[in-house]
Amino acid sequence: KRVLLIGCDPKSDTTSLLFGGKSCPTIIETSSRKKAAGEEVAIGDVCFIRDGVFAMELGGPEVGRGCGGRGIIHGFELLEKLGFHDWGFDYVLLDFLGDVVCGGFGLPIARDMCQKVIVVGSNDLQSLYVANNVCSAVEYFRKLGGNVGVAGMVINKDDGTGEAQAFAANAGIPVLAAIPAHEDIRRKSASYEIIGKPGTQW
């Protein structure tokens, strides 16, 4: 299967784990640099591959110098110019932060750019508050005729307290997986190691 991972967070840190801590040149910064040089952006300038997974980062403005949500919208406009919809991937994973109150970050839901949303959250109140906002946004756009649904929830750093499990039950969504709050996972993540590989514990 052909899989594409797109980081849609202005921090541009989605793909760093995949590439051993290295940051990918973002679509927005590459586009600005190429435009200044009078050149066109090519797919090879912004799309990279490791272990069979293609990946890219949309990027965003520097801290305190613009609107992150607007940057995401601009990033997708550039993707469309590159022929994003004709690339023939079997799965496209969009990693968005949960601030769907911002129209830019809610773009994939609002414009039916994705089929399903997987909510990632932990057992703390702030995380579940954001998860609830995402579910509410999906429901809102479905009432307006949208087709995006919530596939379920992945519980991250699960400490066994059951708060996220209870939230999922109340929200009427299944728990797809629970990633334990384990020191080995934390250590591997901090070292930019891919955690889940065939034949390993995870």
Language model regions located:
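Short, glycine/acidic-enriched loop or turn micro-motifs at the edges of active sites
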Residues: 10-12, 60, 98, 159
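Short, charged beta->alpha transition segments
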Residues: 39-48, 78-82, 104-107
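Hydrophobic residues at beta-strand termini and immediately following loops
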Residues: 56-58, 179
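Conserved catalytic-core segment of NTP-binding enzymes
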Residues: 74, 81-91, 96-181, 187
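C-terminal boundary of histidine-terminating zinc-finger modules
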Residues: 189-202
